[in-house]
Amino acid sequence: MLSSAYPLFRIFPPPRFLIAPAVGLTVSDHSIRFAELARAGRFLTLERFGEMDIPDGAFARGRMKNREAFKTALSEFRKKYRLHEAHIALPDEESYLFHTKNKGLPRRDIRARLLEEIEQNVPLPLNEVLFDYQLARDESGEMSITVFPEKTIEEYLSIFHESGFSPLSFELEAHALARALVSPREDGAIMIINIGKTRTDLSVV
C-alpha cells in the first residue's frame, strides 16, 4: 500500500477511538464509489455505500482528462456523503506490476534487489517512480512489486486534497480486491473478475 500516513503510526498505532473513520474509494471512467465497513464482533459488515456518476470525458483509463470537471465531481461526491478520510484504490492502467524471488536474501538487501528489478522491468528512471511490495506468506520467497509514476501519484494526491479529501493511502485496485475477497489461508491460484460498465479486468492471485 502506498501510504501517505506518518510511519510512526505503524509502530505505535493510536487507540481505535482516536482514529477517524475512513472509507474505501474507487474511481472508474463513469463513476465514483465508496464503501465504509464497521466491525461487528469478529466480523466486518457493510456500514455505508455510495455511488455517483461523473461527466463523460472527465476521467478515462486511469487518467484525468478534464481536471476541473473531475475535481467538481469529487467535491460534490464528498459533500453528498459527508466524507473526509479515504483509502483510495488506483486504477491498474498506470501501474507496472510484476513478481520476483527473494528466497535466501537477507532482509537488509531486499531494497537493493527491488531497485534492480524495477530498473529491468519499468521503462522509467528510478527517481521518477514510487513503489511498494508484498512478501509471500509462505517460504517461496516470492515478492509482488507495484510501481507507479511519481507524477501520477502526485496528481491523485493533489486533486483529492483540492476536493476536500484527506487521502490516507493509495493501493492498486487489484490488490485491494484480492485482500477483500481472498482468504489469507488460501494457497491456490485464484482468478478475480471485475466486471465494469465498459471494461472487464482479470487478475490472478
Which residues does each PLM region occupy?
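N-terminal phosphate-binding loop and adjacent alpha-helix
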Residues: 48-78
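Active-site charged/polar residues at nucleotide-handling catalytic sites that mediate phosphoryl
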Residues: 81
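Active-site neighborhood for divalent-cation/phosphate handling
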Residues: 85-184
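Short active-site-proximal "capping" loops at secondary-structure junctions
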Residues: 32, 54-59, 93-95
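Switch/connector loops and helix/strand junctions flanking conserved nucleotide-binding motifs
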Residues: 44, 60-62, 95-99
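Generic alpha-helix structural propensity
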Residues: 29, 47, 65-72, 105, ...
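Short, glycine- and charge-enriched coil/turn segments that flank and shape catalytic ligand pockets
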Residues: 42, 58-69, 136-140, 182-188
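Gly/Thr-rich phosphate-binding beta-strand-loop-beta motif of the actin/hexokinase/Hsp70
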Residues: 2-53, 86-89, 182-205
